[in-house]
UniProtKB/Swiss-Prot annotation:
<dbReference type="Pfam" id="PF03472">
    <property type="entry name" value="Autoind_bind"/>
</dbReference>
<protein>
    <recommendedName>
        <fullName>Transcriptional activator protein PhzR</fullName>
    </recommendedName>
</protein>
<keyword id="KW-0045">Antibiotic biosynthesis</keyword>
<dbReference type="GO" id="GO:0017000">
    <property type="term" value="P:antibiotic biosynthetic process"/>
</dbReference>
<feature type="DNA-binding region" description="H-T-H motif">
    <location>
        <begin position="198"/>
        <end position="217"/>
    </location>
</feature>
<dbReference type="GO" id="GO:0009372">
    <property type="term" value="P:quorum sensing"/>
</dbReference>
<keyword id="KW-0010">Activator</keyword>
<dbReference type="InterPro" id="IPR036693">
    <property type="entry name" value="TF_LuxR_autoind-bd_dom_sf"/>
</dbReference>
<dbReference type="InterPro" id="IPR036388">
    <property type="entry name" value="WH-like_DNA-bd_sf"/>
</dbReference>
<dbReference type="GO" id="GO:0003677">
    <property type="term" value="F:DNA binding"/>
</dbReference>
<keyword id="KW-0804">Transcription</keyword>
<comment type="similarity">
    <text>Belongs to the autoinducer-regulated transcriptional regulatory protein family.</text>
</comment>
<keyword id="KW-0805">Transcription regulation</keyword>
<keyword id="KW-0238">DNA-binding</keyword>
<keyword id="KW-0673">Quorum sensing</keyword>
<dbReference type="InterPro" id="IPR016032">
    <property type="entry name" value="Sig_transdc_resp-reg_C-effctor"/>
</dbReference>
<dbReference type="Pfam" id="PF00196">
    <property type="entry name" value="GerE"/>
</dbReference>
Length: 241
């Protein structure tokens, strides 16, 4: 970790991850770095932006597999206070009884899995996608002094982890905004989001209703929506319009 202090934490983490070629190798390198900080576990989790009620959760790291399966099966991402925090803040947050007061079962099960002391660091990519880096240890509570000292480290680590996982994994629904809409499709989306019907959009854009509906079908196919209302809501949530 002395090298991290010399190079700067961003450069240090990017450099050690640059040599990793797959998730297994990446996880091993990440763990070696984190164990120097006395952490036993790490998880980088992301929630898909859609669907809204049951977003898909993606987790990477070495959290106990039974816990990961339980977390996903119980849809804990919806109530997890660290996930909620990550949507409104870029600052790290300490896990505590107080933080998890509203979801005691989640906190109890995490403790039962040896995830007793930890913190969460939000991370944002250039497309606005939100990820959460969670670090945990079995023993030794994190003091406020240690937490303050870790802030610059965890922020750099989370950014480097996000970029490397994005490189190694190809699930564009989570990490990228590879869907491309034409200018006309964007216009149709915006007018639909404003409550206009196909007929009204056709008049505004100077095209026939069938042409507007053709654009709607293409939009729904690209974004994975079942109807035009859902498509416009997804487009807003994902930052396309």
């Amino acid at each position: 970790m002395e090298l991290g202090q010399q190079l700067g934490w961003d450069a240090y983490f990017y450099s050690i991850f640059a040599r990793t070629m797959d998730m297994q190798e990446f996880t091993a390198v990440a763990l070696r770095a984190l164990r120097e900080l006395r952490f036993d576990f790490f998880r980088y989790g992301m929630c898909s932006v859609t669907p809204f009620m049951r977003p898909r959760t993606y987790m990477y790291g070495n959290y106990p597999e039974d816990w990961v399966q339980r977390y996903q099966a119980a849809n804990y991402a919806v109530i997890d206070p660290t996930v909620k925090h990550s949507k409104v803040s870029s600052s790290p947050i300490l896990a505590s009884n107080e933080l998890f007061r509203g979801c005691p079962d989640l906190w109890s099960e995490a403790n039962d899995s040896n995830l007793r002391h930890g913190l969460a660091q939000p991370s944002f990519n250039t497309q606005g996608r939100v990820g959460v880096l969670s670090l945990a240890r079995k023993d030794n509570p994190i003091s406020l002094q240690e937490f303050e000292a870790l802030k610059v480290v965890t922020k750099a680590f989370a950014a480097a982890v996000h970029e490397k996982i994005s490189e190694l994994e190809s699930d564009v629904r989570v990490f990228n905004t590879d869907v491309e809409f034409s200018g006309r499709e964007c216009d149709v989306l915006r007018w639909t989001a404003d409550g206009k019907t196909s007929e009204e959009i056709g008049v505004i854009m100077g095209v026939c209703t069938d042409t507007v509906n053709y654009h709607h079908r293409n939009i729904q196919r690209k974004i994975g929506a079942s109807n035009r209302v859902q498509a416009s809501r997804y487009a807003v949530a994902m930052g396309y319009i």
